[in-house]
Amino acid sequence: MTDVSSPAGGAASPVEMSTTSSSSAATTSASSSKPLTNGANKTAISTAAGGVTPGAVPGPGSGAIPASSSSGNQVKLEHHHRQSNNNRPAVTNRSSETKLMTPTGSSSSPSQSPSQTQASIQTQTSQQDRLAKASTTASQQDVDEVARLFEEKPEAFEKWLTERAPPEALSRLQEFIENRKPHKRPSVTSDLFQQWMAASPTVQQKSPRSLSNSSASSLPECRRHLMDLDEGELFMELIRDVANELDIDVLCHKILVNVGLLTHADRGSLFLAKGTPTNKYLVAKLFDVTQKTALKDAVTRASAEEIIIPFGIGIAGMVAQTKQMINIKEAYKDARFNCEIDLKTGYKTNAILCMPICNYEGDIIGVAQIINKTNGCMEFDEHDVEIFRRYLTFCGIGIQNAQLFEMSVQEYRRNQILLNLARSIFEEQNNLECLVTKIMTEARELLKCERCSVFLVDLDCCEASHLEKIIEKPNQPATRAIKSADSFEEKKMRNRFTVLFELGGEYQAANVSRPSVSELSSSTLAQIAQFVATTGQTVNICDVIEWVRDHNQIRAEDEIDSTQAILCMPIMNAQKKVIGVAQLINKANGVPFTDSDASIFEAFAIFCGLGIHNTQMYENACKLMAKQKVALECLSYHATASQDQTEKLTQDVIAEAESYNLYSFTFTDFELVDDDTCRAVLRMFMQCNLVSQFQIPYDVLCRWVLSVRKNYRPVKYHNWRHALNVAQTMFAMLKTGKMERFMTDLEILGLLVACLCHDLDHRGTNNAFQTKTESPLAILYTTSTMEHHHFDQCVMILNSEGNNIFQALSPEDYRSVMKTVESAILSTDLAMYFKKRNAFLELVENGEFDWQGEEKKDLLCGMMMTACDVSAIAKPWEVQHKVAKLVADEFFDQGDLEKLQLNTQPVAMMDRERKDELPKMQVGFIDVICLPLYRVLCDTFPWITPLYEGTLENRRNWQDLAEKVEMGLTWIDHDTIDKPVEEFAACADEEIKDIEFTVTTLNCNQQSQHGSEDSHTPEHQRSGSRLSMKKTGALGKAVRSKLSKTLYNSMDGSKPKTSLKLLESHVSEDMDDKSPTSPSQPQASGSMGRMSASSSTSSAGGQMVDKSKKRSKLCALL
């Protein structure tokens, strides 16, 4: 069945469009219509001019034929049209319709004379024949020629369209193209959403298929046309009419109009179910809609006067509650009927048919109600009931789809609003009032409420109440006591409101106030907000007076008389702490707030909390930045050297570089006092000609040096003297090592400054410790933590008043030297060294000799900084082992902190209990870091060979000491590791008294796999004057051979046997209880001997020592 107004047959041809536009009688017909059949033909003919009366059908002759004429006329008319369609081209079909009309487009008036009517018809017929002939001729003769031209020269056609085509032709061409496009089914797409957002659904242009969109005058014709269909075709046509409609307003209007057509009902109403599962009600979507009621009028009337019917009340309410149909034959005799509407409108209701609308799950989603029959019947019969039920079954599916689509549209709008709120949070970070006002405005408009309020909690009061109290109990340690449960009043005191934002009601614009305690306590709305802030629960109040009565803490006041519904929700921050309360008062339509409203309002509360928290964090950050500036000013003042110190250093005489031994790689600071260290630094700047080269004021340089020294902490190793040694090594590499030929003066200045500042404010702990303890420095700098801090301290000192030694530099030179300083300081991180080492080695292996490129220079400076930072390893042995002691003690202090604070076992180099392994670890440090670095630098720059040679010498010393530890000769059992064991040899020429040695004979045949345990005296049980030997029981052959050789070679050559005999005579066999025994071996094989040497024997042994070998082995004393 073809719809009356649908373009089902496709688009009309351009010739047809030309013909119809030339005739004023066809102005109301669509250009895309095609010939209709059966009943549709009659309707098309009767409505073509728009002026034919409903009771007449135009005939092929001169006048209108009465509707009461025999059906034979209709058959002849249809036959005439069929014959005309067969004999003429399709284009003349419109002309045949036009011939029946006057030139004005109306039917021939019966008052016209036959001659006038005949003349008019003949004139019109001749005009139409000429137009049709011209169109036919053009279509047959010219189309082929034009087509060939278009095919041969499409560029010319395109140029003609763009330059010379008339606007009317372009418009008709566009219309033709649009009409040729297939009709698309409406779908939930972004285009549909955009169309939905562009205009209100009730005023948008509706689909031409919609029967409910027809004008009031055309409805009788449409109805008559549909009534000529059989019942099945009519039913399917009306189902198709509502099947794809997604606008709930349009859908409800179509349903009521179509139901009126099906059941001959005079008018109808449609109610939709709303509310919560415990409080459901019906809302009149459209009310008293007739077949002539326009959609816009129906929607406007329903919006202006919203009718709400609770479930179980009235006829519609009973149908919704029971899900049963109600058919009332005489309304005024039914007690459930409310005649107030009839009294208002003057309409009398006789028969009522009310039926539920259910979804696929069987739940009530609406109620449809029709009133009074129009075909003369006084009641709705069973046939009407059945048609009504069948049609509403399909309508239930359509309503649910439309509601889902409406929900998706609402969600889309909600997301857009929330997106705007998210933008507002970033735009209004510094203005809390503007942010809250914007959020309240959006919430009030979206949820359609009368008033909106936001209460902010006094955070200072809340924080102060959570302070832990330290309570001393008798005979018990101090404990933290926090109440597990506070009373309601105590929680109220913590959540005290300080700021109130109000919008709506008497405040059309946002009002911000700071209510007093008395004002808050006398306001019911404030008390409700206080309750929500205290409990942290959302409150949705439908009856305020009853709710207030149930909560004794809330006192009812006069302000609640006008309050019908309240939705109150807590606002929380990221820590789930209540920072405010949002409150909505009264829906605009007088209904309670729904769960959907609460869900939407929750999103607003979350964004409000995020915005408030973000704004407060921003304010706190601004305050902290101000505090930081004050702290930096104080730090700068106290970190800067005093004027007296500066004047004194300025007036001091600076000795020559040779007197400080600055050119030597064996420089040591042990004999320099603190003032001399500063003078040595000044001398290095002078020798490099930096003071005059960069116009550094001498007093500024002195103050800067003193300030740098002042900002080093008194840790054991990474202190000011370490910085001095690093700077001196850099100076020696530049001068003695001739590295200055590869550097510019500006780079030399940057390197010396970097060396002096590379460990500023060092805390005696490394980067790993900062990360493990999550210190502020580790949070501030994620990589190279301490190195970044050292550079920042360097910048802070330079920015302090009177300390900027770069003040005379140009901006470009300043940026360059600061870049050099930063890169050099960061290069002292060994992690950076390992990253750069491979690239540097590759350049060296390729024979690189040009180091002037930026990347190459950066690599070279980085390697030089690392070489200077670890240069203590190349100092003379007397200096090296003392520095090693300082480094070890600092590491051990960090290990103690890790045990105490982190409860973790430190690594070996930081474990005080494993200090005997220090020589071995030093050898590993030299092999992994120092020797490879110095070797490659020495191969490339041979003038710095002393660093490599000093490192090799110290490695031999540490390796020798590591072997002694392996033999059981450990560090002297002092709390510190001041002296290595070989320094006892220096005392060989002195009389050794009262020193008791414990010598243990070792079972060299016994293997460690026997499960022997270390039986040497624990470290904490050793006396200060006792030397122990480890009883490993499994010394290697090489170690035993070396021990024996050292023993014999240390004796007097003339008395070797006597000395050995003397040694053996004092060895008594003794069984050690801790020595392991094996069942397969006699216990005597693991026997141990103990010897006590008296002072006289020790003296005699000491006299046999060659005095020229003061650093001989310990065994020489035996």
From Swiss-Prot:
Gene: Pde6
Compartmental location: Cell membrane
Membrane disposition: Lipid-anchor
Residues the entry annotates as binding a divalent metal cation 2: D759
Notes on how activity is controlled: Inhibited by sildenafil and zaprinast.
Propeptide segment residues: 1116-1118
Top-level EC class as recorded in UniProt: hydrolase
Record's function text: Hydrolyzes the second messenger cGMP, which is a key regulator of many important physiological processes. Has cAMP phosphodiesterase activity in vitro but not in vivo. Has a role regulating cGMP transport in Malpighian tubule principal cells.
Biased composition (Basic residues): 1108-1118
Residues with lipidation of kind S-farnesyl cysteine: C1115
Molecular functions (GO terms): 3',5'-cyclic-AMP phosphodiesterase activity; 3',5'-cyclic-GMP phosphodiesterase activity; metal ion binding
Feature: compositional bias, Basic and acidic residues: 1011-1022, 1065-1075
Name of the molecule in the record: cGMP-specific 3',5'-cyclic phosphodiesterase
Lineage: Eukaryota, Metazoa, Ecdysozoa, Arthropoda, Hexapoda
